Amino acid sequence: MGYTALYRKFRPITFTELVGQEHITRTLRNQIIANRVGHAYLFNGGRGTGKTTSAKVLARAINCLTPNDGEPCNECEICKAAISGALTDIVEMDAASNNSVEDIRSIREEVNFLPTKAKYRVYIIDEVHMLSQGAFNALLKTLEEPPEHVKFILATTEPQKLPATILSRCQRFDFKRI
């Protein structure tokens, strides 16, 4: 049996299971219920506060075939594929190791394609503050005029390293220490 980190094994799969971030989960659920989901989010907070987990839950919730009170059902075809990592419409990128202009340009090309199964293509860019200046400039063009079927969730521990032009195009959520 392979080793699985505890944070992966016991990662919350609904907003309700997320601990200590009710001010954020309530807002996100209300946006989903009202069908008023933004095109770009910035999740900011220290390590282990739930940024990436919230991004994954949000990506599933907005694509879920049978959402319940703003939560993903985690039972439909889309949710199951997303949980297993098989859904190509939810793309996770670690900007610490994929921080070049070329990496972002490939995203810019991909956003023109419609999702294959889900309603939205969701790009989760973790440690976004690690992008190069050129990569930020390339990302900015997509954030300014994103296609209807694309959502971005940027996660960072250091928002002060992000250009003001990126910050101004995202809904910012500050995660509290738990």
Predicted regions and their residues:
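P-loop/Walker A NTP-binding region and its immediately flanking N-terminal helices
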Residues: 1-172, 176-178
